[in-house]
Amino acid sequence: MTAVAANPTKIGGHGPPLQGMIIRDAVEADLPAIVEIYNAAIRGRISTAQLDPVSIDERLPWFREHSPESHPLWVDEIDGQIAGWLSFHSFITRCAYRGTAEISVYVSEKFRRLGLGRVLLEKAIAHSSHLEINALVGRIFGHNEPSLRLFERLGFERWGFLPRIARVDDVERDLVIVGRHISAQA
């Protein structure tokens, strides 16, 4: 994927216009910003089951598992700052699932509620057929209503529900599995 400039109008109909936004393949130099965004999500306790902050060194193997040709990791860059990221990764490594990818989307606290998650997710849906992906899935905590609404607005359905499967700070949390089939024209 080459860098793609986003339309410099209001993103998702919210907030001020954002000039200079591009979505591009992540490079290793982006890893500190990616980790910073992820660690903020860990502290928020709403979007990941990871409980302890991670280091750049700990995330390096995960970073290197991504490839622009099959399981990309994209960053959303605004005026030289990483505002968010989206990753594709194997859903299940058995051969029959190779056409299914799990996606994760994280947006910096500073850039939330501007529609960046939607822009990243729309790009993932549109690009999936080029990656020979015919289904996308996501795992979202049941109490993460903003993410559930976002995915549902973009055609994802609730494909699974695992009640009280995660324990976060002594609170049992439900996990919702959302999914969407990708048409060849996506």
For the regions a protein language model found, what residue spans apply to each?
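Conserved GNAT acetyl-CoA-binding A-motif
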Residues: 128-140
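Conserved GNAT-fold acetyl-CoA-binding loop/helix
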Residues: 35-62
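C-terminal "cap" of GNAT-fold acetyltransferases
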Residues: 101, 164-186
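A short beta-loop-alpha structural element at the N-terminal edge
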Residues: 22-34
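Conserved catalytic-core motifs of GNAT/GCN5-like acyltransferases
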Residues: 87-90, 137-140, 152, 157-174
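Conserved acetyl-CoA-binding loop-helix of GNAT-fold acetyltransferases
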Residues: 113-126, 145-153
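Acetyl-CoA-dependent GNAT
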Residues: 25, 52-110, 121-122, 127, ...
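Short, low-complexity intrinsically disordered segments enriched in A/P/G/S/L with frequent Arg
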Residues: 6-7, 12, 16-20
